[in-house]
Amino acid sequence: MLCSRLSRPLTRPLRLFSPRFASSSSSSPPARRYGVWDLALIGTGGAALTGLLLWRGSKQDDDMDKPAEGEPTQFTVPVIAQTGGTSTKTLTLLTASETNQRLKENEASFAVSRKNNPVLRYDTNNLASNSPIEDDSCCVILERDAASKVKGDLVFFGVFDGHSGWQTSRMLSSSLVSYVARELDLVFRGSDSYASLLPDSSSSKSSSIWTRFTHNPPKPNPQLDLHDPIMSAAIKNAFSRLDNDIVSAPIRLLDKMQKEGRLPDKDKFGVEHSEALSALLPALSGSCALLAFLDAGRNKLHVAVTGDSRAVMGVWQPDGKGGGKWRVEALSEDQEGTNPKEVARIRSEHPPSEADTVVTRGRVLGGLQPTRAFGDSRYKWPPGTQQKLAAAFHPGSVRGPPRNYLTPPYVTATPEVVTVDLSADRPKARKSIGSFLPVSSPEEPPATRFVVLATDGLYDRLDNQEIVSLVGAHLCGVRSPQTRNSVLSYSSDPSAASPSTFSPHTPRQEPTRGEGEVFTFEDGNLSTHLIRNSLGGAKREQVSVLLSIPAPLSRRYRDDITCTVILLGDPARDGEGGSGGVYRRDEPPFEPLKSKL
């Protein structure tokens, strides 16, 4: 509990946050060009995918101590003293302007006007609790090959919730989409490996027979991407292959160095140490992954989740009386040790003798809360591998394998994939890229669907219905503080929209909102809007207190938060192609991003 030294007491005490992962010390990530968007060509190994790669990584929150304006206002937080007992630390409360600056410093908003692309706009933001932040994110737009009969972009949005370091999430933000693109390229070219997954695979069988007698096999089926199970299989294969590369990289490097006779010298740091750490750290740290892939040509949205980040969609439902509500659709399910389906899956993959130990206290082997993750090799390597790598590479303090580590792997990166047909409930006319101003009534919101992707730092404090209601009310023009019930009136009951009975709508941490007007509508960026309201919303003092606590103390009260909100409408008929059609909305001049080749 926070002890107030303010001239007036805090409105409500703040709950301590229970970390999901044991903390680990890690060096800061390499310098990045903050707030800069890069466009570069991406090659996929085939002709079916070409075009531009657009990404933006998370900015790091390094500046935690800004001077207060005027007379400082102080409060105290409990800390563990060096003697092992409890003590307190006095902190300075951020001013209102400093709080706003902290909330907004990483936000970005983009308007999209690309031909045959249903994305109207997307807003992003991240807020660090760890230092450096362990979350990351990306946005990627790929163009189909110009010769393809199917027109429309392939759009990827990803959020990555790292733990025990930032290295794995950073690798996912730069590599995962490339792995998925390579698998999709095989699907688009009708590869036999995916054609064989068709319900009637006679075409692939005849192709094999034809190949045996001729050198010119028939043209592969070019329509494999019509089949959702095949697209899901491609995404799953990409996730698994990237994770295998991450986990096996240190093992391959050790074999290579042993053959070359150049193992790191334990008494001095050299090139070999640097090379070893670059392979070892992404494998030792871990990350959840949430990837939304929008296939504009097929008008479908594929959402893949590994871990416990969440995706939720709001769908506008007119009531025929000049109004309507936003229907809540959960697009993911938390993969944690408290999910009965995940517990049953893990138990089925190990001997019955381990049934009581594979998941204990809601954690894999009593340690890891998410049951699926990239990296986390201490739950995947064969027994003895970690000790061998530590002896050869001398990485410093590294936790050993968990207890009852008998039949690895215990954790997988293979995702669950949900597919949504966006042609259902098609909207009316598409808005122009400049029509994102508030509307005066809910009769004509500027988008008829939106998707929210976020790491669990957001869902710790807001449930799915609250998130859809907050975005939906914002799109319907609400701009004044609201009670919770008032905000929830903008959405329909989500109970029937849940993909399972495993509480996908419940925040993991009981919020401390209090009564009255608890939600605020003061931010133009929808991701910032959600982040602010997750921390207290209209309870301004609570928001300031939470943001005034520096790392690592802040980790006891809140997690890193990364959020992307995507507005969807009718695909544009006359939008731009090539490298055009993506505009910064929140930074003048209002010009498209330029390619950097």
Predicted regions and their residues:
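PP2C/PPM-type serine/threonine phosphatase catalytic domain
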Residues: 2-597
